Regions:
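Conserved RNA-binding domains used in RNP assembly and mRNA/RNA metabolism
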Residues: 1-75
């Protein structure tokens, strides 16, 4: 398998930060990341603006891959 795919699959089960193309940020536990479409399924997700002042909580959130600009692990 491609190394890029391995990196994405390695994020599954971990807390991640996802920055979206519209400037919003999502933090949550990555349940599944499809390496071909970049679609992401998150549990216990918080959606906020870039400053973090407004936040909304979701139990489960699906993010379309075409909206993702960055995925990073949270420590």
């Amino acid at each position: 398998m491609n190394k890029f795919f391995d990196v994405l699959k390695g994020l599954e089960g971990k807390n991640v930060l996802i920055k979206l193309r519209n400037g919003l940020e999502v933090r949550g536990k990555a349940v599944m990341i499809d390496p071909q479409t970049m679609n992401v399924l998150l549990n216990d997700a918080d959606l906020s603006n870039a400053g973090g002042s407004d936040s909304e909580h979701f139990g489960v959130l699906i993010i379309r891959g075409d909206q993702v600009s960055l995925i990073a692990p949270l420590s």
